[in-house]
Amino acid sequence: MHFVKAKGILSAKNGMNLYRGCSHGCIYCDSRSNCYHMEHAFEDIEVKENAIELLKDALTRKRKKCMIGTGSMTDPYIPLEMKLGNVRKALELVYEYGFGFTVITKSNRILRDLDLLQKINEKTKCVVQMTLTTCDEDLCRKIEPNVSTTEERFEVLKTLRDCGIPTVVWLSPVLPFINDTEENISGILDMCAEAKAYGVICFGMGLTLREGNREYFYEQLDRLFPGVKEQYIRTYGDQYMMESGNSQKLMRLFHRKCEKYGIVHDNDQIFRYLSAFEEKDDGGQLSIWD
């Protein structure tokens, strides 16, 4: 862990990352890619020491309320968060100033902040996004070793459902030769249906590899799945997008099951939903802002 002084905190689309780097150890993580210009070891978490001060200033200056997001680059609920509490402080500001909130995570540590998530959702809108990659617990522990298992995340989704907090699931990535099976996709969607997820984001059945994360991913394949790296190299070479050989069949299954369960599966529609700010008046009615 090391501290830096940040110049700003909110992106043009009102996203923020309170930390840079991660200790969850997911073998496929795109954030390891060199294009993000991280000048420190990925596991050496960079903490923006003035993030909360910057966020307060940014929120007070905004003329129009909107959704504030976090988690696109670094999961905010890393173990360090339980010590520093920056996400909770940010949530308190979001609630105080009447903004909406959405977060992407793989961790059940988010339940620490359930009270604030509920308060935000009662006042405006709060959406929790959670990544699910496999319904096989043993496989999950291999490819995502230091974070909540799929079953634990499923329990979080059901808890949020029971509290009236909407959820969106990212079905990503689908690793060729590892979790690209009908059984896996079907199992994940069954979980989404039971948890009453609003939607499932899926950009296709495959994964992307770039300089930086490719090397790490291949090292982990050698360690965990001997021989699979060679399958990747033979099949895909240096391609950026590595689409599963089962892609078309799996995408048909994905859309069919989402239709059956009434789960939104149009990515554009989901992103519009995530970015739409909703303010609840005293009568429980919604005012929706783009």
Label for each model-derived stretch:
Residues M1-K5, E183-D290:
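Auxiliary Fe-S-binding modules of radical SAM enzymes
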Residues Q118-N121, F154-D162, H255, E259:
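Surface-exposed amphipathic alpha-helices with a cationic face
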Residues M1-Q129, T133-R141, T150-F154:
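Conserved Radical SAM active-site core
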Residues L84-G85, Q118-M130, N179-K196, L221-L224:
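Short, electropositive alpha-helical surface patch
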Residues V47, R109-L111, P176-N179, T208:
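Acidic-and-aromatic substrate-binding clefts and catalytic sites of carbohydrate-active enzymes
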Residues C135-E137, E144-N146, T159-T181, G204-L207:
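Conserved strand-turn element in the central/C-terminal portion of the radical SAM core barrel
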Residues G98-F99, I165, A197:
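A structural motif
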